[in-house]
């Protein structure tokens, strides 16, 4: 055999080390393919697969983020719900179910600003003794204000004779209907309510008036708990959670139909 032929044969035949590496690579590829293929048991009802999980650093980051969000919620949710944003107006609307101390603050608001009239609103009582036909929370608030010394000439009770469904919205609709039927020149008003109920009340009154009047809101501070530490009081937890859920529902899912509006 010539030297040239020997050289060509040497080039055509891979060295033993290269052949070994090639076989090892094929073996690794086969093992990888076998590992990637999910293992099945019990006629394919169970499958075993590889998955990614959080490391301890990842879990620490996730828990830290959740803790931060929780703190932000605790500190910001009450001021968000118990909002006070007045508008310039001559009319004061009072949620009839508020306690007497809220009515006292409403009287101070009325006397300290250029209001000319008070409307009390509310639906039928849910519970109570000696309830007579025609009684309403709006009329009860009217009588309490009268007893506190407010001149009846500057007040008007506007009851919404409904007991169970959409009480705040129906109270707003009753006020709108009264204003339209009596041709009262109301283009804006401030609504007085209690604590975290404020943001939802304003939303529902704006829904009811549908742009025909600007709605301001005044939230009277709830005295049964400290608003800055509401999570330490059962009444505070109940108010914030219930009103938070109710506001979310009203904002996202409440769409009044013709029966509600009429």
Name what the model sees in each region.
Residues 59-75:
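Hydrophobic membrane-insertion alpha-helices, especially the h-region
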Residues 232-260:
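A transmembrane-helix-recognition feature enriched in membrane-embedded lipid enzymes
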Residues 40-44, 228, 239, 243:
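Coil-to-alpha-helix initiation sites in intrinsically disordered, low-complexity, charged segments
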Residues 54-56, 73, 248:
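Short alpha-helical segments used as structural interaction elements across diverse proteins
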Residues 55, 61, 233:
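Residue-level signal for threonine
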Residues 1-54:
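N-terminal Lys/Arg-rich, disordered targeting/topogenic segments
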Residues 40-58, 141-155:
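Short, compositionally biased "basic patch" segments
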Residues 78-232:
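A structural signal for short, hydrophobic/glycine-enriched beta-strand patches
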């Amino acid at each position: 055999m010539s030297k040239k032929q020997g050289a060509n044969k040497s080039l055509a035949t891979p060295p033993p080390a290269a052949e070994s590496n090639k076989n090892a690579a094929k073996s690794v590829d086969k093992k990888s393919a076998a590992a990637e293929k999910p293992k099945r048991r019990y006629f394919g009802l169970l499958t075993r697969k590889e998955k990614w999980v959080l490391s301890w650093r990842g879990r620490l980051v996730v828990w830290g983020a959740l803790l931060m969000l929780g703190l932000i919620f605790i500190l910001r949710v009450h001021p968000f719900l118990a909002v006070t944003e007045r508008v310039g107006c001559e009319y004061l609307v009072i949620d009839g179910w508020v306690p007497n101390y809220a009515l006292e603050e409403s009287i101070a608001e009325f006397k300290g600003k250029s209001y000319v009239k008070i409307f009390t609103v509310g639906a039928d009582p849910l519970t109570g003794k000696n309830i007579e036909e025609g009684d309403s929370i709006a009329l009860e608030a009217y009588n309490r204000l009268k007893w506190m010394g407010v001149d009846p000439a500057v007040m008007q009770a506007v009851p919404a004779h409904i007991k169970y469904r959409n009480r705040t919205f129906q109270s707003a609709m009753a006020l709108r209907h009264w204003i339209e039927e009596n041709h009262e020149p109301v283009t804006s008003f401030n609504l007085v309510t209690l604590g975290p109920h404020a943001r939802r009340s304003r939303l529902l009154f704006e829904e009811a008036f549908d742009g025909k009047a600007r709605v301001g809101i005044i939230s009277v501070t709830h005295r049964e708990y400290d608003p800055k530490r509401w999570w330490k009081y059962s009444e505070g937890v109940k108010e914030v959670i219930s009103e938070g859920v109710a506001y979310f529902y009203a904002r996202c899912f409440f769409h009044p139909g013709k029966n509600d509006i009429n």
